[in-house]
């Protein structure tokens, strides 16, 4: 929804919000991690799962918004108007017309955000508290030898990723053959 709002509407402060979206993308992760840690300390939020989630959302949301906004760039909004002319209300139009068109951008952004999040060590290190994330566990185990559970989880993630890529590429191939 943020991407739709930023793409379609003009409002006061839009340029500022757009500029703020680029900050987590362009600043070094260590600076972002220290900044978030400082903010959480100032507002007395104890480090833990909440700070970890807030930090990762802060870090990853721009990638989702940029992906969806790129999808919107080639979107013809006249199909929404046609939907409403045929009797659909705004909510039905959103779920039946807009969302299916934006779904690849949303999915791509979500996968990119997941990949960045699961790979992130630096920000997680600063904000994690008692919660051990997968990358932190891997970094910790490298010092003493990689534990079997880390190897197993890494293998599952790799196999899952390969299967996902093969399935999506197969689906794309089938669509091209049909055309």
Where are the language model's segments positioned?
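Membrane-interfacial helix termini and adjacent extracytoplasmic/periplasmic loops
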Residues: 13-15, 30-59, 91, 128-129
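Interhelical loop and adjacent transmembrane-helix boundary motif
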Residues: 118-169
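Residue-level signature of the transmembrane alpha-helical core
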Residues: 16-23, 50-57, 98, 106, ...
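Transmembrane-helix boundary motif in ABC transporter permease subunits
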Residues: 1-21, 38, 167-176
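Membrane-embedded alpha-helices of multi-pass transport/permease systems
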Residues: 1, 34, 47, 51-54, ...
